[in-house]
């Protein structure tokens, strides 16, 4: 284990430690090419760039030998997850370079931020972005079964992680323990030929992360459902009723205790 000599946080390897120590320097050297917002880390900057890119109107499947095209990123994402089985035992190769990926999320992120000519593929002008704003992965949730599922999940798993009137903890990120059937199989042992993900700083299998609530999900479906609760324009605006919340604690409490009738 590697340990930061400034804040004493521990990391599984030196690469993750060095990436972490950049934040202590105060220098944000990675800049979004759309809105010029600076970031400490390249992977966080790429995730942010996708909030602009998803507003486009032409999306091509990034997998070699597949020529499918879509008019929304959500449709492309559904296509990749349902038509192409991407995991450790069957990685996919980017059609524009020699890199292989064992995660559809990482492949889509790589393809759209590393290769595309955005002025050609996306006919829009990026609007000024609000602090910490992003575009939700999903459209607002409409299935009643999904509502019941996500609210039950918040009450039993998420609410205890956000006690009211508490201060921000310096402890490691909370890990959701909900055991639900995963959207796809994952392999804990990726091929050595596959690009090492920059965003991974925790040991264990691939997880899905909410950048606003600071929660990692072991299950992709629950991450999808959770992401859909954040509004497109303002992260802590409830997509179900439009209520504005004051940060992640207020947002979690609102989802658990507010009366959402549909």
Curated annotation (Swiss-Prot):
Compositionally biased region (Low complexity): 185-194
Record's compositionally biased regions (Acidic residues): 195-204
InterPro entries (UniProt xref): Znf_C2H2_sf, Znf_C2H2_type
Knockout-associated phenotype: RNAi-mediated knockdown results in abnormal gonadal development in 10% of animals whereby gonads fail to divide or grow in size. This abnormality is enhanced in a tra-1 (e1099) mutant background and is accompanied by masculinization of gonadal tissues.
Record has tRNA-binding as a keyword: no
Gene Ontology terms for molecular function: DNA-binding transcription factor activity; RNA polymerase II cis-regulatory region sequence-specific DNA binding; zinc ion binding
Region (Disordered): 179-204
Gene Ontology CC terms, in alphabetical order: nucleus
Zinc finger (C2H2-type): 2-24, 30-52, 59-84, 92-115, 208-230, 236-260
Places the protein is found: Nucleus
Alphabetical GO biological process terms: gonad development; positive regulation of gene expression; regulation of transcription by RNA polymerase II
Keyword Iron set for record: no
Bilayer-spanning residue ranges: none
Role description: Together with the zinc finger protein ztf-16, plays a role in gonadogenesis, specifically in somatic gonad precursor cell development. This is possibly by regulating tra-1 gene expression.
UniProt family annotation: Belongs to the krueppel C2H2-type zinc-finger protein family.
Protein name: Zinc finger protein ehn-3
Gene that this sequence comes from: ehn-3
């Amino acid at each position: 284990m590697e340990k930061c000599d400034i804040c004493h946080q521990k990391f599984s390897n030196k690469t993750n430690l060095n990436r972490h120590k950049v934040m202590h320097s105060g220098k944000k050297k990675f800049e979004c090419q759309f809105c010029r917002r600076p970031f400490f880390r390249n992977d966080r900057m790429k995730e942010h760039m996708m909030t602009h890119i998803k507003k486009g109107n032409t999306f091509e499947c990034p997998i070699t030998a597949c020529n499918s095209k879509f008019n929304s990123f959500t449709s492309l994402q559904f296509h990749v997850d349902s038509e192409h089985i991407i995991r450790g035992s069957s990685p996919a190769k980017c059609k524009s370079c020699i890199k292989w990926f064992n995660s559809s999320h990482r492949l889509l992120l790589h393809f759209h931020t590393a290769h595309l000519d955005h002025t050609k593929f996306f006919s829009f002008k990026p609007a000024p972005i609000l602090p910490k704003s992003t575009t939700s992965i999903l459209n607002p949730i409409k299935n009643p079964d999904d509502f019941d599922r996500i609210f039950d999940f918040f009450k039993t798993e998420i609410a205890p992680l956000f006690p009211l009137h508490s201060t921000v903890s310096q402890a490691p990120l909370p890990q959701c323990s909900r055991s639900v059937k995963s959207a796809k199989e994952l392999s804990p042992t990726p091929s050595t030929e596959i690009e090492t993900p920059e965003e991974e700083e925790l040991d264990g299998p691939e997880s899905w992360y909410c950048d606003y609530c600071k929660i990692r999900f072991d299950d992709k479906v629950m991450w999808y459902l959770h992401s859909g609760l954040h509004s497109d324009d303002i992260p802590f605006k409830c997509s179900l009723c439009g209520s504005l919340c004051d940060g992640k604690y207020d947002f979690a409490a609102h989802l658990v205790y507010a009366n959402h009738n549909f």
